[in-house]
Structure formats: C-alpha cells, structure tokens
C-alpha cells in the first residue's frame, strides 16, 4: 500500500532500489500512503552491519504500489495484474506479493471459500499467468486464520505460486496464518517462515517485531532469490519443488503449515545436484545416514546396495512407497572409508561414490 520510509531510512548500505511504479495514483512515487511496503522490503533488503540483515540484501528491487490504503475494491486486483505485467516487462525474476483479497467494501464483490480454486478470482488468474512467464511468484497466505473466513486469501490459492504461511520463533503455526487447502485439494500454504514477531524496519528508522504473513512471504522470497542464484539454470518451479522437498513437514504436510519450514542447505543441495533423472544423495561424506532426493514423485521401488572397495555388499535395502525424499541408515557397524552406492529404480541404475566418516 506504500513504501513510506524506504527513501529516507538508511537501511541498506547499497543502492538496491532500481525502479518504482505506482498503479494507484499513477507515476513513480511509491513513498506515500502506508509504510507497510517498506517493512516488507526490509525483511529482504535490509543490510546494516551488526544491526539487521535481510534474506537477500544484494538483490535489486523494483517497488510497485497496487493497493489503496483506505478502501478495498476489485480495482486493486487489476492494479496487481498491471504491476505483474510491468515486472515481467522489465525482466524481474521474482515477485513478492504481501497482500490478499476475499471481501470488499461492496459485499456484492465478495468471494466465498468455494472460490479458492485458483481459477475464479481475477488476481489468482493473474498470478498464474505471471508464473507461466517463468517468474517466481511468492505470496502471503493471508492473516484470516481463526476468523470467520479462516482460509487463504487470493491469490494464495493460485497454482504454480509459492504461498507462504507464518510460524513463530518456535516453529509453531501462527493463529492468524490463513489455512488451506484449496477447494480442489491442493496443498496450501506451500511452506512457512517466521511471520509472528518478525523484525522489520519502521519509517522512523526503528526495528521492531511485527506480525503477518506479509513478512513471512518476503523472508522466503529473499531466501529463494539466493537459492536460485546458486543454480541459475533451474526454473522457478524447480525452486518451489526444492523448497517443498527440503521442508520440515514434507511427510506430514497439512493445511496449517503446508510442507513446513524449508531447510535452505538441503534445498540448495537438491537444486544443484538433481539434474535430469539422477537421484541426489546427501550428505557426502556421511556420519550415520544418507538422505536421498528424487527428481520426481517416485512410485517405483528403489533398491539400495552399499559396497566396499572389494565389491562386498555391506548394507542393502529396498525402499517402497511414494516419495520425493527419504532417509536411509545403512547400519551402525559400518567402518569409516570409501564405498560405492548402487541405486536401482526400475530399469535405471546409478552408482555414486560415498564416504563414511
């Protein structure tokens, strides 16, 4: 709704804002109205040594205002689409969207929870279109949790969009964080990050805690920018998959936390070591267990054989069930040294050298 403070507060030692656009009042002045956008921006772009560092302080930023401060009308959703088109036209890689819609000043314009299918609201359709250009669209899940609506707010229901819910400092889902699923049964939110007690810059230059998925979303967007930079040949959908697969609740996903809180170290390994149909193995060297990342939703049994330098099988197992990721403990009595891991999945055989420490 505005970026008041972003042009006056010394929150970044570098000049990272390269363009601005105002689709509400017109022109390029976005430093008016509300400071919400500045607080959102600070979670990514802040870089004051010894004070506060955001998740992507060296990224370049374009500030786009699409939200009216004092009203809630469908016009704002069209503003959002215009903003997304503008972002695409200037070559933006990632959109962070810290807003959501469900009800409006005129009740005749309201949506219902049955409309949360990603194909009904104009803003969700716009978000899908933006994602199909190759941009990574990251959006807040909404702050309707526990209320009469309780569910996601649009465009958080959009397919191919990374929807982010909120947790507190202990990893517990925030009461206000909007719940999934979508009406067609898709997992939303995709992931979560801290949006309860998240530290942000204020327009007076102070740093204080704030609540909202408006802040968990950019925290993930900034982290995703760094992740993508580490594997520039990946696609936006590859980045989303890496974040999901690496998350804390991948095997117990639900409508509150989605796939969970991403482990960026695992996500980076998955993204950088998972070309084509190859199965990734981590860590290497390994202490007592190995983690396997699959490039697709596997439904085929996987045969594992760990052989020593003499070709002797020291551990083996057949893994069954549908999964993208699994953990294997070869055995507690395996000596430190070099081994060859044979992975058989259907007609495909992969041999990887691993080191036990």
Please give the residue ranges for each predicted region:
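Subtilisin-like serine protease catalytic core
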Residues: 1-21, 26-76, 90-93, 104-106, ...
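Hydrolase catalytic cores
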Residues: 41-44, 64-68, 151, 195-257
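Substrate-binding/access-modulating region of protease and related hydrolase catalytic domains
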Residues: 47, 66-157, 170, 183-186, ...
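C-terminal subdomain of the subtilisin-like protease fold in secreted/lumenal serine endopeptidases
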Residues: 92-96, 229-284, 314
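Surface-exposed, proline-anchored Ser/Thr-rich loop/turn motifs
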Residues: 273-296, 307-312, 355-357
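Exposed aromatic-hydrophobic patches
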Residues: 325-331
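C-terminal tail/sorting-segment detector
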Residues: 332-357
């Amino acid at each position: 709704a505005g970026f008041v403070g972003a042009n006056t507060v010394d929150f970044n030692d570098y000049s990272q804002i390269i363009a601005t656009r105002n689709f509400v009042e017109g022109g390029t002045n976005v430093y008016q109205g509300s400071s919400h956008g500045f607080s959102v921006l600070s979670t990514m772009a802040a870089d004051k040594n010894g004070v506060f560092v955001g998740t992507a302080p060296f990224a370049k930023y374009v500030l786009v205002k699409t939200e009216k401060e004092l009203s809630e009308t469908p016009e704002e959703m069209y503003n959002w689409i215009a903003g997304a088109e503008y972002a695409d036209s200037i070559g933006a890689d990632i959109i962070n969207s810290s807003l959501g819609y469900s009800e409006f000043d005129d009740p005749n314009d309201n949506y219902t929870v049955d409309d949360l299918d990603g194909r009904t609201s104009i803003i969700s359709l716009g978000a899908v279109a933006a994602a199909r250009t190759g941009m990574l669209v990251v959006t807040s899940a909404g702050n309707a949790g526990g209320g009469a609506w309780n569910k996601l707010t649009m465009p958080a229901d959009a397919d191919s969009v990374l929807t982010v819910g909120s947790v507190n400092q202990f990893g517990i889902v925030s009461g206000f964080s909007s719940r999934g699923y979508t009406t067609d049964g898709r997992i939303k939110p995709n992931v979560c990050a801290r949006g309860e007690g998240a530290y942000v810059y204020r327009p007076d230059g102070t740093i204080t805690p704030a609540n909202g998925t408006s802040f968990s979303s950019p925290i993930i967007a900034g982290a995703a920018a760094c992740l993508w930079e580490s594997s520039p040949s990946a696609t936006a959908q590859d980045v989303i998959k890496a974040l999901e697969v690496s998350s804390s609740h991948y095997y117990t996903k639900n409508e509150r936390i989605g796939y969970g809180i991403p482990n960026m170290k695992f996500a980076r390994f998955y993204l950088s070591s998972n070309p084509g149909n190859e199965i990734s193995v981590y860590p290497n060297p390994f202490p007592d267990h190995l983690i396997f990342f699959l490039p697709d939703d596997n439904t085929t049994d996987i045969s594992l054989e760990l052989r020593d330098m003499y070709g002797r099988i020291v551990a083996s197992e057949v893994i069954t069930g549908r999964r993208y990721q699994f953990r294997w403990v070869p055995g507690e009595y395996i000596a430190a040294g070099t081994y060859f891991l044979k992975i058989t999945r259907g007609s495909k055989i992969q041999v990887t050298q691993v080191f036990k420490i």
